[in-house]
Amino acid sequence: MWGLCKNHFPSNKIQVQERNKALKPKKSGSEHKTKQLFPVFNCKKKEKGVMIRFAILRNANTSLLSARSICLFTQAPTYCHVRLNTLNKSITTKRNSLTESKRHVHDGKHFFTTPHQQQQTKLGEIEEGHSPNIKGEDLRSIGQAITHQRNKRRKQIWSAIFGGIFGVILGYSLIYRVIYLKEQSFLPLFPSSKIRKLSTRDLKKVDVNQVQKLSKLRVLEILSGHDMIKEQYGVPLLDKDGNSPTLNEFSMWCEDQDPCVTGIVMEPDDKRDSSHTWYRIPFVCKWRITHRPISIRGTIDDLLNRIGLETADLFEIISPERVYGSFKYEYPLQGDSHALHLWFHGEIELDDDSLIVYNGKYHVDVKLQEIDLFRREKNGQLVQYVLYKNEAGDK
């Protein structure tokens, strides 16, 4: 139903204006300032009353006072109020934006980044383990644990590599060559010197006393024809007691032509007698430590023989210095796979201040390489005189 409160509502324009003046709230300080900033808008000219109709049920018991209050409080806002609220909101938004922009400019941490991006970066560092809360000792312990694990892994890899290589070599030398094929096998260990002392087995094949006598005769023969010895010591050459000079020291050693290695020789355990000293592994093999040369030419010959060729089919090397007495015409010791140079060294004392020192090589006959005279002069200096030197010989 319409118009139950008709007597309490204004019916013309004049009554509407009077009612708006009565209901208009007092101006606050902020609204007054806003009106001064924007004086263009005239609220009196724009104000208009709005008639609101209410539909009340037929059987509802509503007093006129309550109906009038409903009408007053539900009146729609005027155009001026809406405009002022909009302006206030826009001014507040601008002030906030200016404040934020100034804060971003004056804050050096966020000159190129925003606080939101920095927060994400910190979160990412914390997830990766770079948290500032973690102590330096913890970081060092973690680093040491990682380093220890890597070193342990590296040692395991190298141990596996060397273990595999050693297993392959030992399996081929011992299991395949000795046990399966019943052959001799040599396992090299480390390089050795070409010069070594004569073993007891070598001394049995070389007459050292004969070499000593022959070398002394050859030295006295050469010294008797030397001019310096004739003038200062006389001929025949005698010692301070007037007797024939004697040897104070004499030694012999052998030298291989090729580089040598020290290794282990392994053979099947056949229990045969041998001049060597063997160590036995019952029912498996016997072994001993020995020296062997590395013959490059012999290795090439073996490779060519396997394909049906010989070294003479490809080339032949003839050295002009290879004459009688050199290594080419020397015979190897019985039972050895290579020939040896047998060297000797001797000393003959003439008097208290004079000493003859010589060295040479022996093969069937003595071949001297050098003879020196060491003499202490009157001023106390020790002087070496080279009396003989074989330039064509091999040292």
UniProtKB/Swiss-Prot annotation:
Species per Swiss-Prot/TrEMBL record: Saccharomyces cerevisiae (strain Lalvin EC1118 / Prise de mousse)
Listed transmembrane segments: 156-176
Protein name: Altered inheritance of mitochondria protein 39, mitochondrial
GO cellular component terms, A-Z: mitochondrial membrane
Family named by the database record: Belongs to the AIM39 family.
Gene giving rise to this polypeptide: AIM39
Localization annotation: Mitochondrion membrane
Major location (coarse): mitochondrion
Membrane topology: Single-pass membrane protein
Entry keyword set: Membrane, Mitochondrion, Transit peptide, Transmembrane, Transmembrane helix
